[in-house]
């Protein structure tokens, strides 16, 4: 079995609290230097990397002089706000040593649920990756309530994987991977090297093993892998204490548990766009645009749209129909229906003049467009 990381181009790496803190007592700066070095190695290989990092609350607890992790939500949020400053400062320092720039991105589950915010977050992250910047993502613990719970950053890692359509999610933890049972209680438990993400038997195997430092046990990682597989991403759950673990995974070495998505990325996205989104409106295409979208799989430009039907917002799903009214594609609109009516039949260069701003040059980007 070869690690999927060898062939993956876009990777989300989630690093747990126990791998970036001194047993919960503030940040482990030597560990951060190691992660920066390994991620820099991946990027030298031509890979795009997004880092989802825990550690803000633990660093905040240290800076505030508290002896233990608080149980009250408002105190956790205060610790997160204080600690996030130190986390960003530390990551900026260690990545600068490798001539890499970093960007802080704080997200909530609500950002993923709202289509407009979802598209904005996606566009920002993809722009950062195109600029060779390392986005460092954490949950916005200062403003959320229900999300400061078990497994928040495991879930966040999977959501980010879906958001940017990454090829793989790597969840680094202080455990070797998944066993058929808790090896601390069952010495005969067997290690699971590879399985299909979403297999219900995996959840029974996961048990409740987890670190006291972080908030996620193995079950949350299994569920995160299941979520990541929805966009066709394979997940690797591996021990972050293995020497050069990311570089070795990139070499193809089989480390940890690999949970394979059953559908590839494009098949998963096609199913999601075609079957699971409620259509909010229709765009009527001229013959040239209909041919370009269906035959050449191009983005849909405003100049190719001759009519806009219905009322929709940026990020809503819309049907694309030809001049005979037959649906030929559907996708996520970059502009609202009102804006679309203003820019239809116009070349891209006119968007800023017509709207006063330009978001994206296309009405629907080809990555958000599926032919039917």
Swiss-Prot record:
Substrate binds at residues 54, 141, 153. One of its GO terms (molecular function) is RNA binding. Keywords: Amino-acid biosynthesis, ATP-binding, Cytoplasm, Kinase, Nucleotide-binding, Proline biosynthesis, Transferase. Its EC number is 2.7.2.11. InterPro entries: AceGlu_kinase-like_sf (IPR036393), Asp/Glu/Uridylate_kinase (IPR001048), G5K_ProB (IPR041739), Glu/AcGlu_kinase (IPR001057), Glu_5kinase (IPR011529), Glu_5kinase/COase_Synthase (IPR005715), Glutamate_5-kinase_CS (IPR019797), PUA (IPR002478). CDD domains: AAK_G5K_ProB (cd04242), PUA_G5K (cd21157). GO terms for cellular component: cytosol. GO terms for biological process: L-proline biosynthetic process. It comes from the Bacteria. ATP binds at residues 14, 173-174, 215-221. The lineage of its organism: Bacteria, Pseudomonadati, Pseudomonadota, Betaproteobacteria, Neisseriales. SUPFAM superfamilies: Carbamate kinase-like (SSF53633), PUA domain-like (SSF88697). Catalyzes the transfer of a phosphate group to glutamate to form L-glutamate 5-phosphate. It catalyses: L-glutamate + ATP = L-glutamyl 5-phosphate + ADP. It is found in: Cytoplasm. Gene3D superfamilies: Acetylglutamate kinase-like, PUA domain. This is Glutamate 5-kinase. Pathway: Amino-acid biosynthesis; L-proline biosynthesis; L-glutamate 5-semialdehyde from L-glutamate: step 1/2. Residues 280-358 form the PUA domain.
